[in-house]
């Protein structure tokens, strides 16, 4: 009995101090550093509680009301709430909330709509696409005939005429619109016109901008697309996971079958419960304000960096992210990411269109505002952050080495700690 009592009551700090210590260190990092990775965000306490709940104990293969296990009546409530809230949030008729990740949601669409060897079109990785949009190192690029489209070299904007021409030539079965590092508004209507002309399905991967769509800061892909996929973290501010949305009942059945039993077994019910919580939060009026502030902050950061002597790919941003071309500062993405990290500013190196550097080096970094906006940062803070970034990069240019400029980085680090200290997170932890 004593062993059972300990199993159910002994806290993590006692059971596994190594993991507890790692979590505590990560909490400290998140509290004290500025998070600018565009695909990351900060979830609410309510989302954390749902994801860390006893729903993790339950197996629930199948869908609500049609499970292959007994005892699912309460996890069914959670999944039904997630589905209904997702449908309301994006104004659609069908939602599958079971995909465990963004890659799996996209794979499910491929499984439902394509056969190995079929042709599809997607944004080239070097132009801001995603691995699952046809990269040769990804399953999507190995199993299918991929025709990539990209941006123009002169302005780094999507070349829609070239997309149309390529579609007419290659007759894809599926066209994917959406990306991970494109900072401008997507013309869903034009993509649908191209898809209709060649008899293709239009799939929109809005993983990065779903929160902006929900917050009325970016046009919705509906009614133009046949299917939209999105992760549930990033700008949507939920737990890590994926989701598939459509208005077509026949396609919805195919997507459901593709997710289960096609790709996954038992869904992660604790994550689905957390998705439901996040969708509920996104349905509140204050989420509209949040999404608007994300975009305002991105514009403020972008403009500050330009004033500091940096180039922004495509000349600016209309959403939550920007690609920063570092070549004017004589820096690489690899070197800049490391230097900014030492100064407690977290970002990721990222290739820019037509990048002369290798993928592990790059000529750019990608920056995003969702996490900082969640903390409460507004334009004034992002102007300050932009100036700190320029300060680090100018110091790096003077040092001209991987070691960077320790004096400048230490000074900026102190300023970052002062800034983040004014915007506490998870005070109960």
From Swiss-Prot:
Known catalytic reactions: (6R)-5,10-methylene-5,6,7,8-tetrahydrofolate + glycine + H2O = (6S)-5,6,7,8-tetrahydrofolate + L-serine
One GO MF term: glycine hydroxymethyltransferase activity
InterPro entries: PyrdxlP-dep_Trfase (IPR015424), PyrdxlP-dep_Trfase_major (IPR015421), PyrdxlP-dep_Trfase_small (IPR015422), Ser_HO-MeTrfase (IPR001085), Ser_HO-MeTrfase-like (IPR049943), Ser_HO-MeTrfase_PLP_BS (IPR019798), SHMT-like_dom (IPR039429)
GO CC terms of this entry: cytosol
Enzyme class: transferase
Cellular localization per UniProt: Cytoplasm
Principal location class: cytoplasm
Pathway: One-carbon metabolism; tetrahydrofolate interconversion; Amino-acid biosynthesis; glycine biosynthesis; glycine from L-serine: step 1/1
Site positions per UniProt: Plays an important role in substrate specificity: 233
CDD domains on file: SHMT
Keyword set, alphabetical order: Amino-acid biosynthesis, Cytoplasm, One-carbon metabolism, Pyridoxal phosphate, Transferase
Cofactor(s) this protein cannot do without: pyridoxal 5'-phosphate
Pfam families membership: SHMT (PF00464)
Similarity comment text for this entry: Belongs to the SHMT family.
Function recorded in the entry: Catalyzes the reversible interconversion of serine and glycine with tetrahydrofolate (THF) serving as the one-carbon carrier. This reaction serves as the major source of one-carbon groups required for the biosynthesis of purines, thymidylate, methionine, and other important biomolecules. Also exhibits THF-independent aldolase activity toward beta-hydroxyamino acids, producing glycine and aldehydes, via a retro-aldol mechanism.
Protein's name according to its UniProt entry: Serine hydroxymethyltransferase
Lineage: Bacteria, Pseudomonadati, Pseudomonadota, Alphaproteobacteria, Hyphomicrobiales
Gene for this chain: glyA
């Amino acid at each position: 009995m004593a062993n059972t009592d300990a199993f159910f009551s002994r806290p993590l700090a006692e059971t596994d101090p190594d993991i507890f210590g790692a979590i505590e260190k990560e909490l400290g990092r998140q509290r004290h550093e500025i998070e600018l990775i565009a695909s990351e965000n900060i979830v609410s306490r309510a989302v954390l509680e749902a994801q860390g709940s006893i729903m993790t104990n339950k197996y629930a293969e199948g869908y609500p009301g049609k499970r292959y296990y007994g005892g699912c009546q309460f996890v069914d409530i959670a999944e039904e709430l997630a589905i209904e809230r997702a449908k309301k949030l994006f104004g659609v008729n069908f939602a599958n909330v079971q995909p465990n990740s963004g890659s799996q949601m996209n794979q499910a669409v491929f499984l439902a709509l394509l056969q190995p060897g079929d042709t599809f079109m997607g944004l080239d990785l070097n132009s801001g696409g995603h691995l699952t949009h046809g990269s040769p190192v990804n399953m999507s690029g190995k199993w299918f005939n991929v025709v990539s489209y990209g941006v123009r070299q002169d302005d780094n904007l999507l070349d829609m005429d070239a997309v149309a021409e390529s579609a007419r030539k290659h007759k894809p079965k599926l066209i994917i619109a959406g990306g991970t590092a494109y900072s401008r508004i997507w013309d869903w209507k034009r993509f649908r016109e191209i898809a209709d002309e060649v008899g293709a399905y239009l799939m929109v991967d809005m993983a990065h901008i779903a929160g902006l769509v929900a917050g009325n800061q970016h046009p919705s892909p509906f009614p133009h697309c046949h299917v939209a996929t999105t992760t549930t973290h990033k700008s949507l501010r939920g737990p890590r996971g994926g989701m598939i949305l459509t208005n077509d009942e026949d396609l919805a059945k195919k997507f459901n079958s593709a997710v289960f039993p096609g790709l996954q077994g038992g869904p992660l019910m604790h994550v689905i419960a957390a998705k439901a919580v996040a969708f509920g939060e996104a349905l509140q009026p204050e989420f509209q304000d949040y999404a608007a502030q994300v975009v305002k902050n991105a514009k403020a950061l972008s403009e500050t960096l330009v004033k500091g002597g940096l180039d922004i790919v495509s000349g600016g941003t209309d959403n939550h992210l920007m690609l920063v071309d570092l070549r004017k500062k004589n820096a690489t993405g690899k070197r800049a990411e490391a230097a900014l990290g030492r100064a407690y500013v977290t970002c990721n190196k990222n290739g820019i269109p037509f990048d002369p550097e290798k993928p592990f080096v790059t000529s750019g970094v990608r920056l995003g505002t969702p996490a900082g906006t969640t903390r409460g940062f507004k334009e004034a803070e992002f102007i300050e952050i932009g100036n700190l970034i320029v300060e680090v990069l100018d110091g790096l240019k003077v040092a001209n080495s991987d070691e960077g400029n320790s004096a400048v980085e230490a000074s900026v680090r102190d300023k970052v700690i002062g800034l983040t200290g004014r915007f506490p997170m998870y005070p109960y932890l």
